């Protein structure tokens, strides 16, 4: 019976424990979406995690939807990330870069006046993140079929640059209502070309992007992030089980290192079915505690557990969980504010 503190092999990478740091947007990058010394220190502080999944990182300027988030399309960004990976490795850690395109969850403010792109011209309900006064999401521009190859190539180049920056692998962000998720789910994908309609067509872009990353890294250093809950950024699918089972089966055929799924503890969870369909290491990610994390591992419904907010407030989360120690409370008002406050100043155990 596995516990959080047992080692695990993901792909060809052996982890000392099953505690994964989930991707966490923190809005601390420098001008030009360049990672900086603050970020290197932040990630190094958390290197005891079995695996760090970096904050979501845009593969193209048109994939940005939040202020001061990092990218992986320029040489300066590669140099900035290189300092991060060196710091994590010096502290004994392992880190994958999460490759990201927000699709319609953006605004011309972030895109040099351009409209966001999406599978279909359907605006998301809600308001643009971290913009005041609040403004609703605009109606995005539907991508032409011929443009989609450029999206795949941007991910492939992002994977190459991640390797140049010293990462241990990459995770494809296919979750939370961003571009690849928008193609996958039928509420946001109304296309009539080979990227829309059937489940096979709607999953095509995610799988092409995965194959592009595999061409750079090999399958054993590629993971995929999914959100079968389908509840972020005005998403929805008419048959979640059928859609996500197809995707996980296809990813399983490719032999990727893992799936990390933000869907694990609700009564209507389909995580067990998806884990079976995938057949490989399955990381659960949804507001876990020490007890609930060990419980899902003991049941065999997940192979590792990703923690998000607890890692923000507890750089030594692994040791705190090991000791059953009290956790620092998070300070949400500092999650996206820049600077060291609420970023580098959480206390560790004495």
Give residue ranges: language-model regions.
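Flavin-dependent oxidoreductase catalytic cores
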Residues: 1-350
